[in-house]
A protein has these predicted regions:
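Active-site pocket-lining/capping segments in soluble small-molecule metabolic enzymes
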Residues: 1-25, 29, 35-178
Length: 178
């Protein structure tokens, strides 16, 4: 109530950190009026039949995570998010060591693009928008400028202009990308 009273324009998002992998859990979360958006686990990104059956009011609340790099078969996602959250808050707790294939390599956009849950531009345009979905989330704000640039080029720049934009940015000595 404090937030509603003092910050009336603030909206709440049910985060991907809840790891909503069960579609029924997603539907229950979408029915909660306090959330403007609900981010399902990336493994539900391709549940097209069930997603398409949602009423438009719920479709408007779904915010898809497009470029998740986490292994599709991961069973430790919740523990990972909890450890990261504790660390960000400066709280004590057990460290999480990811045991997924390729985890030691860190985030790789190429690996994210090969993930079955990946949503690229073509899928947004040809599949999700026609089904009534309009909210998409790009992961990685803390991954570094060069990687964020690649996300922005992929999602916001026509392919024929990507190299030109990349060169202009990389060759601009005023920018500190690396």
């Amino acid at each position: 109530q404090y937030l509603k009273k003092n910050y009336p324009s603030l909206y709440l998002v049910s985060s991907t950190t809840k790891v909503l992998t069960d579609f029924n859990d997603l539907q229950r979360e979408l029915a909660r009026p306090e959330f403007r958006y609900v981010v399902p686990d990336f493994r539900l990104n391709r549940a097209f039949d069930r997603l398409a059956a949602l009423p438009q009011s719920q479709k408007d609340k779904v915010e898809f995570l497009c470029n998740e790099c986490c292994w599709f078969g991961c069973t430790e996602r919740r523990a990972c998010y909890e450890a990261v959250s504790r660390k960000n808050l400066g709280l004590p707790g057990p460290e999480h060591y990811c045991s997924a294939p390729g985890a030691a390599d860190g985030y790789r956009f190429s690996r994210a693009m090969a993930n079955p849950g990946f949503i690229g531009i073509k899928a947004i345009r040809d599949t999700y928008l026609p089904k009534g979905f309009t909210q998409f989330k790009i992961e990685g704000r803390g991954l570094g400028s060069a990687l964020i640039l690649e996300f922005l080029l992929h999602y916001l720049t026509k392919p024929e202009y990507q190299l030109t934009v990349r060169e202009e940015l990389y060759l601009d000595t005023m920018l500190d990308l690396f």
